[in-house]
């Protein structure tokens, strides 16, 4: 819902850099005011990271099961203003690493931007970066491995318990 970000920032006269492309770009450009800049797709990872590092905040108005871009922004120490549904509810800590807005409307996002401008966030850039590390690939692999080992141990114990019962029944 990039359209919400474009409309909210146009209404508030706030600078917004839109990175990426797609079939909606002509429509987005038509609704954009003079404070909206479109970079298109094809930027290198380093260029995108540079924008994350310089951004005051990152707007994530869509709803996704997880959504990697809020975590990427936080890995640069950038607070995230996200629609409070889906994966953003796990990756964004309201008032600390960013804010949630309640409805997917221009008004709700604009209110969230104004609250962020007024109140800021409690976490420093380094604390936001540290929070993003809790979503690392290494952590995921470690926790998945630990889970599998626990389940295997439980399963092994169940097999041992079952073999005991079967032996008694055979005797």
Please report, for each region that a protein language model flagged, where it lies by residue.
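Short alpha-helical donor nucleotide-sugar binding micro-motif in glycosyltransferases
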Residues: 50-55, 144
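Short hydrophobic beta-strand element within catalytic cores of glycosyltransferases
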Residues: 79-83, 92
């Amino acid at each position: 819902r990039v359209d919400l970000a474009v409309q909210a920032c146009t209404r508030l006269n706030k600078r917004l850099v839109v990175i990426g492309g797609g079939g909606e770009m002509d429509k987005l450009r038509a609704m954009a005011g003079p404070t909206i800049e479109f970079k298109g797709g094809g930027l290198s990872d380093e260029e995108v990271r540079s924008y994350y590092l310089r951004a005051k905040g990152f707007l994530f108005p869509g709803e996704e099961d997880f959504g990697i871009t809020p975590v990427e922004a936080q890995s640069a120490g950038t607070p995230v203003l996200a629609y409070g549904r889906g994966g953003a509810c796990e990756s964004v800590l309201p008032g600390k690493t960013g804010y949630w807005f309640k409805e997917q409307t221009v008004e709700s996002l604009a209110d969230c931007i104004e609250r962020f401008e007024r109140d800021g966030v409690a976490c420093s850039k380094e604390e936001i970066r540290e929070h993003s590390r809790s979503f690392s690939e290494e952590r995921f692999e470690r926790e998945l491995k630990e889970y599998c080992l626990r389940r295997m141990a439980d399963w092994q114990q169940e097999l041992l318990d079952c073999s005991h019962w079967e032996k008694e029944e055979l005797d």
